Amino acid sequence: MKKIILSFIFLIVGGYGQKYFQQDVAYNIDVKLNDSLHTLSGYEKITYINNSNETLDYLWFHIWPNAYKSDSSALAKQFIRLGNTKFKYTKEKNRGFIDSLDFSIDGIKAGWEYHSQWNDVIKINLPEPLKPKEKILIETPFFVKLPKIISRLGHNGQHYEITQWYPKPAVYDINGWHPMPYLNMGEFYSEFGTFDVKITLPKKYRIMATGDLVGGASEIAWLDSLAKEGDA
């Protein structure tokens, strides 16, 4: 009995002794909307710094647009559990996905594989182990077919709601990796990061988003004109 108690106390003390850390993730994304085909074509660069005390041999990544791909996704199954059939009866042409992924790490091609349960989570095998305090540059093209709005990503005609649309690393923290599928109910546990995003749209569109506009004097003037119309 004493051995069990001592072991339990040791585990608690050991857990409190570990230091908190966050991985450092910086995104650079260039993406273009095709409003005829309802698609996104993009290229992504991610600078990833390993602030943990562990050496990483692989990274878990979320490719959440695949949640809209088939009836076997965690999203589809959640809808069914909740008695919602709108995903089940969505036509194939109105569903979504992400493909054209071709990952490289510091210029070296990296292999990857799907999670055993979820089609919207993948594991990227690193060409070289990522040691503590080291950084890598992750690059990949990507192509997203936007679904008709079923959940938070999609379109209704030429109105677009774009969220969780790019490949992103899962959180790695003091408790290890946190790969998770996209779900309609619940929120997302993601690494804090910085974003530099270039978005190309047909001229008739306007973006409503957070962030700091770079070189957007004409956009600010347009918004000011709308404000004046509203005050009139």
Which role does the model predict for each range below?
Residues 131-140:
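Short Pro-Gly-centered flexible turn/kink motifs
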Residues 48-52:
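Asparagine-centered strand-capping/turn motif at beta-strand->loop junctions
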Residues 16-41, 156-157:
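N-terminal, polar/Ser/Thr-rich
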Residues 18, 29-32, 46, 111-113, ...:
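Beta-strand-rich interaction surfaces with strong enrichment in secreted/lumenal proteins
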Residues 1-4, 94-96, 105:
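Positively charged n-region of N-terminal signal peptides that target proteins for export
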Residues 83-97, 101, 113-115, 141-232:
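Extended, low-hydrophobicity, Ser/Thr/Pro/Gly-biased non-transmembrane segments
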Residues 3-13:
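Sec-dependent N-terminal signal peptides
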